[in-house]
Amino acid sequence: MSIRKQYDTDLESLKNSLTEMGRNSADAVENALEALCVADADAAAAIVKGDARINNMERDIEHRCMTLLLRQQPVAGDLRRISTAMKVVTDIERIGDHAADIAEIIPHLVTVRKEGDPAVSQAIVMGKKAHQMILDALDALTAENENAARRVIAADDEVDYDFNAIKHQLAQEIAEDPGKVDAALDLLMVIKYLERIGDHAVNVAEWVQFVRTGRYKDESMF
């Protein structure tokens, strides 16, 4: 195999690994939402345990990116793709971390909030929107689709709106019954992690724009 063919193969393998890692993180978020919905502490524990695999994938991808940069000294589009992989792998790993963070809270919520709790139900709706943002960001990354990336960025406004609405509702809960403060704070942390997940999806989308244009947040890079 020629050097160029091997290089192209390595780039494609890197792209596939990044996609696989992204799907694992997205699945972790989906599983966390399902565990939250049915108050399943055992499922939550499995999500926390599974985060180690996502962390290992991050380290592997970072190593492969550095190897390609040092051995091949890529330019133009290939350099942007590898640089983007090194950036988005961090966001994807953080998405997995936040899924595990949510899972760690679930056993506490089980004891203080009943199934069908309105605030929990609203948090799940918010979470589904954030989860869809992840899927759409990953699709945009795979296809290098700038228009799809823009739609992901625009979708974050709705997740932010939900976060603020639920936060206000939880504040009202505490005002009406200070004894509910622990239950409210636990759920506040859940929605904060979901809001951050949406932010990480936006970050991925912004790096898709960089791949296509060489500009990141309206600043020219290379």
Which sequence ranges carry the predicted segments?
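Cytosolic, long alpha-helical scaffolding segments
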Residues: 1-222
